[in-house]
Amino acid sequence: MKLGGPLRVIAAMVALHASWPLAAQAHQSISLALGWGVDTARSPERDIVRLWQAYLADRPDSNHPSPHWSASEQAEFPDFDLLRGYVYQGFPAWTVVQLTPAPGADSTYVLRTLVAGTYDSGKAVKPLALFRVYAVRENGRWVLGNAFLRLTRDWPRETLGSVTFVYPPSYHFDRSRARASARFVDSLAAAFGLPAPSGVRYYVTHDVEEMFRVMGLDYFPSGHDTAGGRSSAVDRLVFSGFSKLGEGYRHELAHLVFWPMTRVGHTHWLVSEGLATWTGGAAGLDFDGLLPGLARYVRAHPDVSLESIASDPPPREGTLDVGYDGFAVLCEMVFKKGGVQAVKSLVAAGSSVDEVLGTAARLLGLGRGDLDAAWRRRVLGILTP
């Protein structure tokens, strides 16, 4: 999920057009075991495992400077551990399943780890992730580094405007679509009076499986979804796992544009996702294309409300994400009533549901009790009687 989103493994499974999930809020000790065939009798293998153990013992679920991670990566990426929100979710059983030299790279080792939970007194093991980091030499010592930088090292890339697109050698790069995405970043930033993000890296992949693999996740639960995207606004990174959109995954680019508004931590995660959905679409559809599915859902669920959606978002089904789409409509309503400044007020309303909905009602000139009725009218208004 996006930074600021709910910490639930299932949420990360069903919302693949989201951004990063949050890392665990409280660090739990990690038990690191060595799998069959992982030999640490000699160096550098012994030193690398000790390095990994030291990093895992130093609150890896929270973002803080680490002597165990590449200094150059920490300088480039403010939230330097790309997989922080995915793998550090309180699962206690960690096993190093591979520690081998990386093919085609000097002084570089692949460190692949399985994260799992145990159940029924240890009789059942349920994996959360199989992921990789790399151990590299930097300033005469071993440090850890992200997989995506090594796995895409030889990929073609092209810079258009403020966005550098990186794509597999087998991929047919759509320069026209990429140029339109770069223009979208600039125009959206200008419309909201925000500085356009610079130095954006946009990684194009064919599908979600390849996207996760490039990020370093050889396995991560993705449900039935085969397309989606991820972004890290603070690191100016976008990963597109949807070949239909390729260079045009605007939802994730919108998150980067709105980062100056949402980074202070006073924005409800669904307001952030709704804003990106309203301006950048989601699941391969633009905002208008998402509305019919939402309208059919609202008509079939007469008791649904903004509060119920925010408190317990329904699982995504196909292209329908009631939380994202429903709050996109709310953002649109607020914009039509009060323009950009009203949207900024909604974004700054706070992280609680009561703060968000109370502010939305005020911005729309409604009583709190009338907000849902107005929202339903807007959603259902697109359906033919």
Language model features by range: what are they?
Residues A24-A57:
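Short, low-complexity N-terminal intrinsically disordered segments enriched in polar/charged residues
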Residues K123-W155:
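Short beta-strand edge/turn micro-motifs at domain boundaries
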Residues A33-W36, A57-A102, M211:
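Short solvent-exposed beta->alpha transition segments
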Residues F80-A124, F239-F242, R250-L253:
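Surface-exposed, charged secondary-structure patches
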Residues M1-I10:
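Bacterial N-terminal signal peptides that target proteins for export
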Residues W155-H268, T279, E355-T359:
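Juxtacatalytic substrate-recognition/specificity segment
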